Amino acid sequence: MNQTETTPIRVRKNWKTSEIETLFDEQAGRIDPRIYTDEDLYQLELERVFARSWLLLGHETHIRKPGDYFTTYMGEDPVVVVRQKDASIAVFLNQCRHRGMRICRSDAGNAKAFTCSYHGWAYDTAGNLINVPYEAESFACLDKKEWSPLKARVETYKGLIFANWDENAIDLDTYLGEAKFYMDHMLDRTEAGTEVIPGIQKWVIPCNWKFAAEQFCSDMYHAGTTAHLSGIIAGLPEDLELADLAPPKFGKQYRASWGGHGSGFYIGDPNMMLAMMGPKVTSYLTEGPAAEKAAERLGSIERGTKIMLEHMTVFPTCSFLPGVNTIRTWHPRGPNEVEVWAFTVVDADAPDDIKEEFRRQTLRTFSAGGVFEQDDGENWVEIQHILRGHKARSRPFNAEMSMGQTVDNDPIYPGRISNNVYSEEAARGLYAHWLKMMTSPDWEALKATR
């Protein structure tokens, strides 16, 4: 892509709160396209969304032993994630306090300490400054306790590692709220929990991070129309006819009561799952001992064996597909680019052949070269390209689908539930929470919106 196509569009500075409040109109279902392109809004996102939200960093099985570490990002801030001797996890800014060079330049490994390659300042695995070259001769008054990198709060949920820079933010359990119920469809099917398949895929898409987060939060609509038709046909089992693959009409969409999280799923017909993940994975998830145990653990046959092709986003940038078992973080790289970091989880006690089949099918479908992943990326990239036009940014997008069709008292599913899986209720929830974060000066103000 031409370099100019990813250059930020700067059209104004110093957005006022009253102006930001006009960018999303939930009652009318209107989205101002400038939220996907404006550089000044993006800089405010880094401060008010990414510096204050619980962000997914990885899985606990990425760092099994003391000293195991990996490097990743919180927003655009690089961080180091390290397993401690007491089995806890430390997360700290990957920035030396001397001149700002990275403390750790490796993707992952095991270490007893980290040494900056520029001037040799060294830090222990908790991020504490422990050694400064020529300290006695040149830094007579240096208090090393004052010169450690910034440390983040760390909490986990059923194997997933989250971190937050804001000491005043609510705890992770409260932040996730009802979303935990839906996360469990992938994370808690067995008492053994989940483990990662080794390796993280990383690729860059020239589009705004919100397009990706919104689709995984709310958009079953594209899957039920034409976007993935060619990939579905390619994966069609020989004993199924195309006529058998009419998209299911029964399903639900979940919008968090507060927090911007969302999910959607079909209920019942496994044929679409067969076309996407093949008979081996589909059988494992819907029938036999593993499915029966999952149904018992999750509390119903429907939750354990009947939910198909679920999609979900935990606000802002943690997304996954239970059943496909891909988990990814959408790392923002300016208003016009996102870096995707994706990994696959499996039930820790699943047979080896099932784990291998999940690995193979996820690579085929939702990976850097996956058939469905490329469909999604093509749409997002083209939208972002079109939004370089002045007129293209001047008219609102429609987000009216299934407005006024939610209930708050579903007998099984918590949160605000739409009984029409083809809904944009969760998308409206995501943008409504984005707006709260962009217009709230601190977490005390955010708590008041709950």
Curated annotation (Swiss-Prot):
This is Benzene 1,2-dioxygenase subunit alpha. Keywords: 2Fe-2S, Aromatic hydrocarbons catabolism, Dioxygenase, Iron, Iron-sulfur, Metal-binding, NAD, Oxidoreductase, Plasmid. This dioxygenase system consists of four proteins: the two subunits of the hydroxylase component (BedC1 and BedC2), a ferredoxin (BedB) and a ferredoxin reductase (BedA). Pathway: Aromatic compound metabolism; benzene degradation; catechol from benzene: step 1/2. The lineage of its organism: Bacteria, Pseudomonadati, Pseudomonadota, Gammaproteobacteria, Pseudomonadales. It comes from the Bacteria. Fe cation binds at residues 222, 228. InterPro entries: RHO_NdoB-like_C (IPR043266), Rieske_2Fe-2S (IPR017941), Rieske_2Fe-2S_sf (IPR036922), Ring-hydroxy_dOase_2Fe2S_BS (IPR015881), Ring_hydroxy_dOase_asu_C_dom (IPR015879), Rng_hydr_dOase-A (IPR001663). GO terms for biological process: catabolic process. It catalyses: benzene + NADH + O2 + H(+) = cis-1,2-dihydrobenzene-1,2-diol + NAD(+). One of its GO terms (molecular function) is iron ion binding. Its cofactor is [2Fe-2S] cluster; Fe cation. [2Fe-2S] cluster binds at residues 96, 98, 116, 119. Its EC number is 1.14.12.3. Residues 56-163 form the Rieske domain. PANTHER family: 3-PHENYLPROPIONATE_CINNAMIC ACID DIOXYGENASE SUBUNIT ALPHA (PTHR43756:SF1), CHOLINE MONOOXYGENASE, CHLOROPLASTIC (PTHR43756). It comes from Pseudomonas putida (Arthrobacter siderocapsulatus). It holds the Pfam family Ring_hydroxyl_A. Belongs to the bacterial ring-hydroxylating dioxygenase alpha subunit family. Binds 1 [2Fe-2S] cluster.
